[in-house]
Amino acid sequence: MSETGSIADGYAAADIRAAEAPLLAAGAQLMRVAAAGLARVCRAEAPSGPVLVLVGAGNNGGDALLAAADLARDGRDVRVIRTASRIHGAAARAAEAGVPITPAEELDDAEVAALARASALVVDGILGIGTTASPALRGEARRVVAALLPVILGAGGPVVVACDIPSGVGCDDGQVPDPTVLSADVTVTFGAGKPGLMRGPGRALAGRVELVDVGLDLSGATPVARAAR
């Protein structure tokens, strides 16, 4: 396991992507390791009850889909809402594990809210650090999160676990250009801390941050943020 960074160190998204590249080229199972760590935290935060997983089109959604498959194999009732027009290839693993995947456009706001009310846990796997434009949610992703927010913020709402970074939070600056963001109870981040979890509004929205070591070598990179000690 890599010891090149700790949760106290926040590295720029570009540096993290550069550190991932050689591992991906060598066929390293980064996503598998990340998903196992995400599933482990989900089990700890909500040991029983249904799980609702929100996924986008990128690798963040892939991590969440593999974690959904792991939880379904535990015997959990897991459902996925696809918030983008495309879905990561890991959807096949989730489907093999018996996880139903529903396109967001097939659910109205009341149905989205009902799924959240029936869930013990919501996993936010919509956007990750690969987002290069504004992190603000758009389209169906924004609509789904807006429908969930009253349930999440209400009494007795489900636990929210964010995958790598809460969707809608800027990875490097922690800024939130649109308040339509699910505030996480726990953020499971991969490889190294993200500055956006330590700065600006993103710090409060991240909740407790758990680091999953995926073996990144960041020895040549300089941290750009440090968590408060």
Swiss-Prot record:
Catalytic EC class: isomerase
Segments passing through the bilayer: none
Enzyme Commission (EC) number: 5.1.99.6
Co-factor: note: Binds 1 potassium ion per subunit.
Protein residues bound to K(+): 60, 124, 167
Protein origin, superkingdom: Bacteria
Residues annotated as domain YjeF N-terminal: 11-222
Positions bound to (6S)-NADPHX: 59-63, 128-136, 164
Keyword Isomerase: yes
Molecular-function annotations in GO: metal ion binding; NAD(P)HX epimerase activity; nucleotide binding
Catalysed conversion reaction: (6R)-NADHX = (6S)-NADHX; (6R)-NADPHX = (6S)-NADPHX
Keywords attached to this entry: Isomerase, Metal-binding, NAD, NADP, Nucleotide-binding, Potassium
Cofactor(s) it depends on: K(+)
Function: Catalyzes the epimerization of the S- and R-forms of NAD(P)HX, a damaged form of NAD(P)H that is a result of enzymatic or heat-dependent hydration. This is a prerequisite for the S-specific NAD(P)H-hydrate dehydratase to allow the repair of both epimers of NAD(P)HX.
UniProt record similarity statement: Belongs to the NnrE/AIBP family.
HAMAP family: NADHX_epimerase
NCBIfam families named among the record's database cross-references: yjeF_nterm
Protein name: NAD(P)H-hydrate epimerase
Taxonomic placement: Bacteria, Bacillati, Actinomycetota, Actinomycetes, Micrococcales
Protein's gene: nnrE
